[in-house]
Amino acid sequence: MCGGAIISDFIWSKSESEPSQLGSVSSRKKRKPVSVSEERDGKRERKNLYRGIRQRPWGKWAAEIRDPSKGVRVWLGTFKTADEAARAYDVAAIKIRGRKAKLNFPNTQVEEEADTKPGGNQNELISENQVESLSEDLMALEDYMRFYQIPVADDQSATDIGNLWSYQDSN
């Protein structure tokens, strides 16, 4: 503190009636160091109700999971509701970690096995959800591009698409 003095020992508290008690060892309170575990009062509260998801500022829910074998985060997609995102996390967690995975819905695995019919394809259901999610994202992107007056190939003829500016034309 660059030549300054520490004066905290000379400022009296409300419990000390007179400044004359300053500096006396008996009047000082001995502080017990507080450990980090005592400050928390148990478990840390989650921001979200579910594991592996977060809410975007515009309201959609994003899901991702960390793949420990690759050391990277795996993007699972964006969803309308927190439940959908949490279920996507559960499916990925079971694929990555197997039976030891911590799930948002522990009974989901039993329900999924009961719902799967012999000959039914669960990949079709997942791909339909992905198509729906991607189409919503595409519509949002098109709205963004229209707002900034960026040309969008939207049911245009091939000549109109050819007239759009491209990187190759600028060189």
Curated annotation (Swiss-Prot):
Cysteine sulfinic acid (-SO2H) sites (modified residues): 2
Disulfide bridge positions per record: none
InterPro entries linked to this entry? AP2/ERF_dom, AP2/ERF_dom_sf, DNA-bd_dom_sf, ERF_plant
- Can you cite an annotated GO cellular component? nucleus
Query: What domain of life?
Result: Eukaryota
What are the protein's UniProt keywords? Activator, DNA-binding, Ethylene signaling pathway, Nucleus, Oxidation, Plant defense, Stress response, Transcription, Transcription regulation
Transmembrane stretches in the record are none
Region annotation Disordered: where it falls in the sequence = 16-48
Picking any one GO molecular function of the record gives: DNA-binding transcription factor activity
Which SMART domains does the annotation name?
Answer: AP2
Q: What induces it?
A: Induced under hypoxic conditions in roots. Induced during hypoxia under nitrate nutrition. Induced by osmotic stress. Induced by infection with the fungal pathogen Fusarium graminearum.
Annotated Basic and acidic residues bias: 37-48
Subcellular locations according to the entry: Nucleus
Ranges annotated as DNA-binding: 49-106
Task: Quote the PTM field.
Answer: In presence of oxygen, the N-terminal cysteine residue (Cys-2) of ERF71 can be oxidized by cysteine oxidases, thus preparing the protein for N-end rule pathway-mediated proteasomal degradation. Under low oxygen levels, Cys oxidation is prevented, ERF71 is stabilized and confers tolerance to hypoxia.
> GO:BP terms for this protein?
cellular response to hypoxia; defense response; ethylene-activated signaling pathway; positive regulation of DNA-templated transcription; regulation of root development; response to anoxia; response to water deprivation
Instruction: Give a short account of what the protein does.
Output: Transcriptional activator that binds specifically to the cis-acting element GCC box 5'-AGCCGCC-3', or to the CRT/DRE element 5'-[AG]CCGAC-3'. Plays an important role in root development via root cell expansion regulation. Transcriptional activator involved in the hypoxic stress response. Plays a role in low oxygen signaling and contributes to tolerance to anoxia stress by enhancing anaerobic gene expression and ethanolic fermentation. Plays a role in the regulation of hypoxia-induced root slanting.
> What family does this belong to?
Belongs to the AP2/ERF transcription factor family. ERF subfamily.
Q: Mind telling me what this protein is named?
A: Ethylene-responsive transcription factor ERF071
- Organism for this UniProt entry: Arabidopsis thaliana (Mouse-ear cress)
